[in-house]
Structures are given as C-alpha cells and as structure tokens.
C-alpha cells in the first residue's frame, strides 16, 4: 500500500486598480480640465482544502484506476471582479507539463495529475499548466463568490510504483485585474 496525501498551499495576490478618468469642457475664454483618480479596494478571500487519498495499492496507481478527487478553490469577494488570472507552481517540480503532472517530495515513482474540473477556467478535463505562467480564464466571473474545481489523481511516473509517502504542495497565485 502507498500512503499519500496532497497538501495544497495557496499564495494569493489581490491588486485592484481603476484607471484615472479625464474630461475636458470648452467654456468661453478657455478650456477647463479636471482629473479624477479613483482606487477601488475590494475585499476577497480564497480557500482551498487539502486532498488526501489515504492508502492506495501500488497496482491501482499503476493501472490508473484510482478515482479523481476534487480540490475546490473557493473565492469570495465583496463585489464581482472584472477578470482574474491563476498561476500554479509545484513545490516539488513538474514531471510532465503537457499532461499537468507534478512530482512528489519523497517518492519519485508517484506524481499527481491536475485537470480542470469544469469549464470555469478552461475546458473540462484539460491539463492544468503548472509552470508559473499566468492563466487567463475563458469565462469571466459572473458573481462575487465562485468556486474553481480542480481534479487531482495519483499517477505512476514509470513502470514501477514504490510504496511510501507521496506528498507534495501546489502553490496557487490568484490575481484580480
């Protein structure tokens, strides 16, 4: 049996800015120009839970028969944000960028595959890019609070799956713009 759990660490960045607005009015004798600068400060919180698979048979991981689990990134703001980006980095490195597979800390034979759980960000079941590049979602938020589901699954990184812990961390940077 392989004992593993996926621990997720999330780093969030929330800069919010609205650009300056300028207007000009023609009046007798000259032009009056006024400038209005505005900074919008919205409050947001984001949470993500740990994902634990418990003990799994090495053969099941090798066959790919361990079921996906959903890791939910829950975002709650006091207003609907216009747009956002997500950036993912893996604490223990990336094994297969094209398929969204990250390494684990102490077990080089097991990794985790990350896929989108629905079409909130990108098409469902497409691999998540874990390389520090900002991902702009396909769909903009339509509510102040929303959830982004991410499918997580342990996968074999070769022909042999060794018993032991298979822990890792995923860093998520969420930027609203």
What spans do the regions from the language model cover?
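Mature extracellular/passenger domains of Gram-negative fimbrial/pilin and adhesin proteins
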Residues: 19-177
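Sec-dependent N-terminal signal peptides
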Residues: 5-13
């Amino acid at each position: 049996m392989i004992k593993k759990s996926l621990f997720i660490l999330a780093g969030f960045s929330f800069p919010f800015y609205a650009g300056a607005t300028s207007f000009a009015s023609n009046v007798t004798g000259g032009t009056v120009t006024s400038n209005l600068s505005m900074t919008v400060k919205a409050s947001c919180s984001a949470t993500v839970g740990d994902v634990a698979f418990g003990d799994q048979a090495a053969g099941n991981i090798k066959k790919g028969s361990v079921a996906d689990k959903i890791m939910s990134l829950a975002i709650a703001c006091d207003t609907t944000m216009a747009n956002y980006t997500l950036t993912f980095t893996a604490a223990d490195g990336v094994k297969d960028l094209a398929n969204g597979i990250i390494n684990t800390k102490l077990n080089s034979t097991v990794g985790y595959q990350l896929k989108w759980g629905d079409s909130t960000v990108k098409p469902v079941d497409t691999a998540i890019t874990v390389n520090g590049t900002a991902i702009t979602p396909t769909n903009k938020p339509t509510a102040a609070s929303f959830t982004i589901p991410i499918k997580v699954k342990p996968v074999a990184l070769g022909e042999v799956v060794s018993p032991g812990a298979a822990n890792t961390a995923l860093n998520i940077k969420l930027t609203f713009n």
